[in-house]
């Protein structure tokens, strides 16, 4: 067992896998896929989900070695420590308990010796009551009109997760029916264009604004909040703010100072990281206002089902653990720096951007949890696009350029099926034909010999050859309901945690986002003094000075 100050790459389990890479270098996926027993062993089913990872560049013995790696990394203990509320976010001295946000009412999950589940449900019950008042029209705006439009202001984890879930549910029949006559929009960027787009076509009289900021000091969020407060007060007067703005925050003093009734503030806790907060009031409040709490509760139950699977299932059948170990294999041993997330569902168009943050903010680290520089890369560059759109965009590179492991996500039953008379298959079958074909195209490729048999001209054979041996996995969901969306979210959250646990890093802090904020403060002060007092640029390097000079000379901002 490695000591706390040793790097995990020095363990025998890690070194064993390093040697194993050399052993399998010449093994092609064509050969691996011909072994039916191996393929069968790489199918995992849970609660209607089917995972197929047989197209990973991993013989059976690779999986055995990866499970040994998990043991050497004390993965069982680390998962238990997370669920037990220990302060595994050591740099911020915090528990990591997003699992408590979707736990059943009778569950016991402790932080600092106290069961937090009752607190979670107090907030959920408050959200349920408030959202029902808004949706029923018993709570009205300053002019007596029902509030049918919601703008949620937040950034990063306060925006990407809720946006993903909202987009996924927009065409779900149950959610669609529940949202009739309502709109939900998300304002994140401080670019005034984002404000203009969000308020376009909306009437302040029928709009409710949800301001999401734990401290109520997040620069971008609070500037946007002040901007929409001005929009409301200009139309309805200052007293309207209390009727048209609510908060998700723990800083009740600043909430009240802003003009929002503290009774209309919904709490969350230090043990919830921003990118893991979609199951807290951050996501549950705006989503409940749009779809009703009963729909959102199903989303929470789906996530909880995966939490329980993750906590209790042996690793060889544990979907998030297997996915996490395979990601470590692809990144640290096979040297693949990226991952494509490819949902064959337009409803999941915002899934990849959310997981991009969850993954890259969590595992984009350069030191171990003990502060030692890492001699290996962690994390991967996550990107993606729904199929088949991505096929006409970046799949060319995936097939014949760099090797990029792919996650294919398919849905058995469409949210909005279409059957056209005279067509060979339904629209959804056409979509799914591509879902099933692409992983095989990546795995098998096409050889020069095959092309010769097809009488392809010699000069085109090099251009039409596909090397294959490009890894992917397939995740098949029975349908895309609120419950399934919750499952999908939790699978990826826990997968990311597994990667971090194995790499020996802290996946729950994000110091990398701080430096740019600090430097922006200096620029902000300079812009203010230059615009109001004509102060000369000072304290910047030549490059930044030149850019700032051009910006100040040519922009037409009014004097503050």
Swiss-Prot record:
The modification N-acetylalanine is found at residue 2. It comes from the Eukaryota. Its EC number is 5.3.1.9. It is an enzyme of class 5 (isomerase). The keyword Isomerase applies. Pathway: Carbohydrate degradation; glycolysis; D-glyceraldehyde 3-phosphate and glycerone phosphate from D-glucose: step 2/4. This is Glucose-6-phosphate isomerase, cytosolic.
């Amino acid at each position: 067992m490695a000591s706390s100050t040793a790097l995990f790459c020095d363990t025998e389990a890690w070194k064993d896998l390093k040697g194993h890479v050399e052993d399998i270098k010449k093994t092609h996926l064509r050969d691996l896929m011909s072994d039916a027993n191996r393929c069968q062993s790489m199918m995992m089913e849970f609660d209607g989900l089917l995972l197929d990872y047989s197209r990973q560049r991993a013989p059976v013995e690779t999986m055995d070695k990866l499970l040994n790696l998990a043991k050497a990394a004390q993965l069982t203990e680390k998962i238990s420590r997370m669920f037990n509320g220990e302060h595994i976010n050591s740099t911020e001295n915090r528990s990591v308990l997003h699992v408590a946000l979707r736990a059943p009412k009778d569950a016991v999950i402790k932080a600092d010796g106290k069961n937090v589940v009752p607190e979670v449900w107090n907030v959920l019950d408050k959200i349920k009551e408030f959202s029902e008042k808004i949706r029923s029209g018993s709570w009205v705006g300053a002019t007596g009109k029902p509030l049918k439009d919601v703008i949620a202001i937040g950034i990063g984890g306060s925006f990407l997760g809720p946006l993903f879930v909202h987009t996924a549910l927009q065409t779900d029949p149950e959610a669609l029916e529940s949202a009739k006559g309502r709109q939900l929009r998300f304002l994140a960027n401080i670019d005034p264009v984002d404000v203009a787009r969000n308020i376009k076509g909306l009437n302040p009289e029928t709009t409710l604004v949800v301001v999401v900021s734990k401290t109520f000091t997040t620069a971008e969020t609070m500037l946007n909040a002040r901007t929409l407060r001005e929009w409301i007060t200009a139309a309805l007067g200052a007293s309207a703010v209390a009727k048209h703005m609510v908060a998700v925050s723990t800083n009740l003093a600043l909430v009240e100072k802003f003009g929002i009734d503290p009774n209309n503030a919904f709490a969350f806790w230090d043990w919830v990281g921003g990118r893991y907060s979609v199951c807290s009031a951050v996501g549950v409040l705006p989503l409940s206002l749009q779809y009703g709490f009963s729909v959102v509760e199903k989303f929470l139950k789906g996530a909880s089902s995966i939490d329980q699977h993750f906590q209790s299932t042996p690793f060889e059948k544990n979907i998030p653990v297997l996915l996490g170990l395979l990601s470590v294999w692809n990144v640290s041993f096979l040297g693949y720096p990226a991952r494509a997330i490819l949902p064959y569902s337009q409803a999941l168009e915002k899934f990849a951007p959310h997981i991009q943050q969850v993954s890259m903010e969590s595992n984009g680290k350069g030191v171990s949890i003990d502060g030692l520089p890492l001699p290996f890369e962690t994390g991967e560059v996550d990107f993606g696009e729904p199929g088949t759109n991505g096929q006409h965009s970046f799949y060319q590179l995936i097939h014949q350029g760099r090797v990029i492991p792919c996650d294919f996500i398919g849905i058995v039953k469409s949210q909005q099926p279409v059957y056209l008379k005279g067509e060979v298959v339904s629209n959804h079958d056409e979509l799914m034909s591509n879902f099933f074909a692409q992983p095989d195209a990546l795995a098998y490729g096409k050889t020069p010999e095959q092309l010769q048999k097809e009488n392809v001209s010699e000069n085109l054979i090099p251009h039409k050859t596909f090397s294959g041996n490009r890894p992917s996995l397939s995740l098949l969901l029975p349908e895309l309901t609120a419950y399934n969306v919750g499952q999908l979210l939790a699978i990826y959250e826990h997968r990311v945690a597994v990667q971090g646990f194995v790499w020996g890093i802290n996946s729950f802090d994000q110091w990398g986002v701080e430096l740019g904020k600090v430097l922006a403060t200096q620029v902000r002060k300079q812009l203010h003094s230059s615009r109001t007092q004509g102060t000369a640029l000072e304290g910047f390097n030549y490059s930044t000075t030149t850019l700032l000079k051009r910006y100040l000379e040519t922009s037409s901002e009014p004097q503050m």
